[in-house]
Amino acid sequence: MIGYLALARETFDVEFAESKFSNAKSLLLSLSPSAIGFNELITNDEDASKALTFFKSNPCDKIFLFQTTFTDAKFLLNFAQEINKPICIVSFPEPRTGGRLRLNSICGLNLGMHSLIKNSITPEFVIMESD
């Protein structure tokens, strides 16, 4: 069974992050209709605890984690250590506009990968080019 969840930080464009999560989730479900997931953006410790409980109650063979915005790696590292299943982090590029990034998702991917690898966890990653 494949599982999915999404991380976000509320200081970024949460509405845009939701749309990225929705589109990516739709693609995943079209490829793996039996995939299950935590369908709320994880933006705080309470959401993180609920997501961890969900996946402990619904074991999966692999997890797709949608890094919809930049976040620190605290939840990702804790989740990976607790669940102990292969993780693929999916990130979303955005065009350079000269202004502030709306998501900064790839930076979150970089930080998450660094944290996991530093702790002897070897994730996979995908940069989802378009919706």
Located regions from the model:
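An N-terminal assembly and electron-transfer interface module characteristic of large anaerobic redox
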Residues: 1-131
